[in-house]
Amino acid sequence: MPNILSLTCICFNSVIYPTSFFFAKLPEAYAIFNPIVDFMPVIPVLFFLLAFVWQAAVSFR
């Protein structure tokens, strides 16, 4: 039961403050990884596009 309550609170807080979820800043010690972290959401899209390139290479068998 406490797990469900805490999950509900987390979801409720993310609804109230949606910008803090998308624009969170890394701690200063990890600031050098900012470019990598900014690029990470694009990686699944690249795999999706790679599937089409691969299928085109094998003539969509």
Swiss-Prot record:
SUPFAM superfamilies: Photosystem II reaction center protein K, PsbK
UniProt-annotated location(s): Plastid, Chloroplast thylakoid membrane
Topological category with respect to the lipid bilayer: Single-pass membrane protein
UniProt-listed GO biological process terms: photosynthesis
Family: Belongs to the PsbK family.
Subunit annotation: PSII is composed of 1 copy each of membrane proteins PsbA, PsbB, PsbC, PsbD, PsbE, PsbF, PsbH, PsbI, PsbJ, PsbK, PsbL, PsbM, PsbT, PsbX, PsbY, PsbZ, Psb30/Ycf12, at least 3 peripheral proteins of the oxygen-evolving complex and a large number of cofactors. It forms dimeric complexes.
HAMAP family, per database record: PSII_PsbK
Name the UniProt record assigns to this protein: Photosystem II reaction center protein K
